Amino acid sequence: MSYYILCARLLALDLRQTAEKNNCFIFEAARNYHEKAFTTIKNFLADKQIWGADFNYAKYSSKMPDLLAGQTPNVFSNRFAGGALMDLGIYPLYASVRLFGKAQDATYQAQQLDNSIDLNGDGILFYPDFQVHIKAGKNITSNLPCEIYTTDGTLTLNTIEHIRSAIFTDHQGHQVQLPIQQAPHTMTEEVAAFAQMIQQPDQTLYQNWLDDASSVHELLYTMRQTAGIRFEAEK
């Protein structure tokens, strides 16, 4: 009997090696990475020169009242690898890697607790010819859209995950609405992608998933180091 591993966060190298050794798949549950919207967006941007992007995901945590009352919920604990970057910032990072590939370098500055865990922060991903600005937050809520800047105009997304709308506005003000069909549930397309991979294995695509996951976590590590975010397991 074969078993497949679904990892909600932190797809580690040793898990990847274990999966390969046992001839099974390991999937990281980064739901926006598998949205069909990103294929549509990437195809639309293919003939355009990118000048930069602003991606954000900040949502006030239901655990904030506990934190303010003096408790340390898991999402704000260095023992459980918590914080805004790890919990929500991973979605803008996956979007950037999905659309533009791995950045050359990254940095992150944050509002932090005494245990070094970030409540919110701003990061920059450095590509050869442009930068992607990242905002993540768990003690704030952002209602800002996400934008991708090109030489021809700006592509505006209503959000960075479970995308409903993508509208390109050129420098003359003319607009084009991309054919985005929002899935009925945030995890619908992710689950469908995993099921298809199991039923109809595609090793090339699977390796691309793993490589992109590795790129995301290398960037996360670099960003944490620049902000001084330290997890208990690393001490």
Predicted regions, residues:
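Predominantly a Rossmann-like dinucleotide-binding segment in NAD(P)-dependent oxidoreductases
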Residues: N32-Q104
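Beta-strand-loop-alpha-helix segment that lines the small-molecule cofactor/substrate pocket
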Residues: M1-Y33
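C-terminal helix-rich "cap/oligomerization" subdomain common to oxidoreductases
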Residues: K21, A193-K235
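Active-site loop of classical SDR/Rossmann-like NAD(P)-dependent oxidoreductases
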Residues: Q181-A192, N208
